[in-house]
């Protein structure tokens, strides 16, 4: 087994080896079995962990998205688009004696509009219609301010994958452009970072091609394996949707949650129980345990395995235990323009703990933000 190493510029992170080399198995079937065996070991570790201190959900934007991608072509609806609500998670957690802050998916909405797929869609329908189909929420900085969190308090930023992302505003650039989160490290899977520089034609529609150009790489932590960030919070490799896809797992006072864009609704992870017309029938006929968010078909088998891993690590939804607490970073939302395509159960947010009291504690506690903890 290849040892998972700690990134050189983030010695405070702990490598996780439960899944190990399973993703390198060349046989799709054997890889699936090996990854899920590792996932069960990882589940035991996560279940025994202390919970994170606080989690909040910060809405970013709504956007139209092809129905055929959202439910892998399984939804029996004439509506060409669903409406997705894209959200960011704020997580506060202990890392040794310090309290740390992570933003997961802090997408720069204005820069993301340059993503070729969405730029062409806006060009086809016109900017006025595009604005009617999307809603922008308060900037993340304003939402964080209401929670008592300043941009300088953010220690880490990470994304489930780099589709639609332009990182220059978040991290600043080598030529002096300011960073929105001046103290944050970006936790970036090396596999996807490298692919971003040499995109395949099947990938180009979903990336802002120059979205990483000029970014200060001294602010980037390149990762190659699964990582424990601190008490109750892990970033786990879930390749398939993209080469470097990763899922955030957090243990909260309401059980274990995961967050990724491998699916767009709880239905994707539990299709047998879906009330979206066509989804349960497709799953039954094809003997599928999950239905993909399928805009990137080149990695479908790996994505299926990744979603199966996610199901193992998270807990059931207490109010609807046939579904699991996999929170889509872009969740299908009810829309009059997409009748019959509402999720069978809407998650909408992950919420745990008290962010403000944690923030006050972190500044005063030994080893908190005011201490010379590793950066």
Which sequence ranges carry the predicted segments?
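C-terminal regulatory/interaction regions
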Residues: 2-49, 299-375
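Beta-strand-turn-beta hairpins that frame and shape the catalytic cleft
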Residues: 48-55, 92-101, 227-235, 254-257
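Conserved beta-strand hairpin/beta-sheet module of binuclear metal-dependent hydrolase folds
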Residues: 62-143, 247-263
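A short acidic (Asp/Glu
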Residues: 68, 166-171, 198-199, 247
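Active-site neighborhood of phospho(di)ester-bond hydrolases with catalytic His/Asp-centered motifs
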Residues: 103-105, 155-162, 187-189, 237-240, ...
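Active-site metal-binding motif and surrounding structural segment of the metallo-beta-lactamase
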Residues: 123-184
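Metallo-beta-lactamase
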Residues: 132-138, 143-149, 180, 185-237, ...
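Active-site/pore-lining binding-face segments in mid-to-C-terminal subdomains
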Residues: 230, 234-311
């Amino acid at each position: 087994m290849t040892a998972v190493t700690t990134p050189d510029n983030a010695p405070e992170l702990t490598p996780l080896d439960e899944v190990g080399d399973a993703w390198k198995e060349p046989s799709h079937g054997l890889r699936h079995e090996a990854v899920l065996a590792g996932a069960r070991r990882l589940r035991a570790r996560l279940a025994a962990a202390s919970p994170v201190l606080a989690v909040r959900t910060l809405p970013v934007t709504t956007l139209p998205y092809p129905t055929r991608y959202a439910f892998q072509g399984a939804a029996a609806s004439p509506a060409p688009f669903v409406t997705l609500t894209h959200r960011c998670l704020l997580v506060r957690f202990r890392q040794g004696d310090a309290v740390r802050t992570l933003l997961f998916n802090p997408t720069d909405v204005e820069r993301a509009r340059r993503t070729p797929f969405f730029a062409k869609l806006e060009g086809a329908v016109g900017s006025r219609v595009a604005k009617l189909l999307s809603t922008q929420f308060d900037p993340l900085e304003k939402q964080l301010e209401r929670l008592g969190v300043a941009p300088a308090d953010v220690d880490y930023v990470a994304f489930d994958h780099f589709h639609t992302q332009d990182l220059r505003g978040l991290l600043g650039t080598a030529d002096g452009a300011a960073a929105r989160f001046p103290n944050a490290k970006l936790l970036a899977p090396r596999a996807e970072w490298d692919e971003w520089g040499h995109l395949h034609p099947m990938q180009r529609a979903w990336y802002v091609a120059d979205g990483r150009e000029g970014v200060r790489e001294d602010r980037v932590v390149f990762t190659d394996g699964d990582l424990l960030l601190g008490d109750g919070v892990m970033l786990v490799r879930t390749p398939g949707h993209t080469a470097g896809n990763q899922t955030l797992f957090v243990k909260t006072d309401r059980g274990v949650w995961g967050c990724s864009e491998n699916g767009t609704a709880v239905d994707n992870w539990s299709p047998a129980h879906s009330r979206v017309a066509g989804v349960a029938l497709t799953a039954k006929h094809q003997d599928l345990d999950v239905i993909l968010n399928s805009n990137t078909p080149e990695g479908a088998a790996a994505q299926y395995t990744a979603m199966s891993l996610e199901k193992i690590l998270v807990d059931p939804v207490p109010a609807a235990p046939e579904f699991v607490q996999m929170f889509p970073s872009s969740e299908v939302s009810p829309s009059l323009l997409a009748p019959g395509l509402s999720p069978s159960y809407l998650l909408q947010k992950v919420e745990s703990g008290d962010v403000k009291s944690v923030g006050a504690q972190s500044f005063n506690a030994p080893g908190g933000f005011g201490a010379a903890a590793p950066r």
